């Protein structure tokens, strides 16, 4: 009988042992920057999906200058955060301001607004 009591007590203690701290929760997703690459073929990716608060980096891998601006041309009033990129010379990278408002922003190369391959969208979601 005593042995049964000891075994039962030990089992209860073992079940109750362990950390009283709750299991760690996975880290919240961080807002990581995203990249648009500009080449002689155009921008890639054409359509980019980012989280609110993200800054997008435009990398000019082309041999000529590009002036990235928000739609519509020539007013550039759609997403002012994109207009901070402005002129990007070959080999240079520039970031937008934080894209905070949930929406879709169109952009283009101001120097070549008619070239479809140099147009894209950033969706903040």
Model feature map: region roles:
Residues 29-55:
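N-terminal edge beta-strand
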Residues 13-16:
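C-terminal motif of bacterial Sec signal peptides marking the signal peptidase cleavage site
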């Amino acid at each position: 009988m005593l042995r049964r009591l000891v075994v039962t007590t030990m089992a209860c203690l073992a079940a109750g042992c362990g950390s009283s701290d709750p299991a760690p929760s996975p880290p919240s997703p961080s807002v990581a920057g995203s990249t648009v690459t500009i080449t002689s073929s155009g921008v890639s990716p054409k359509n980019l999906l980012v989280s609110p608060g993200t800054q997008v980096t435009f990398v000019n891998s082309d041999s000529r200058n590009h002036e990235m601006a928000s739609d519509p041309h020539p007013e550039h009033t759609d997403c002012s955060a994109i207009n901070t990129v402005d002129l990007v010379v070959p080999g240079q990278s520039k970031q937008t301001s934080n894209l905070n408002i949930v929406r879709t922003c169109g952009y283009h190369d101001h120097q070549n607004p008619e070239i479809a391959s140099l147009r894209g969208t950033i969706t903040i979601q």
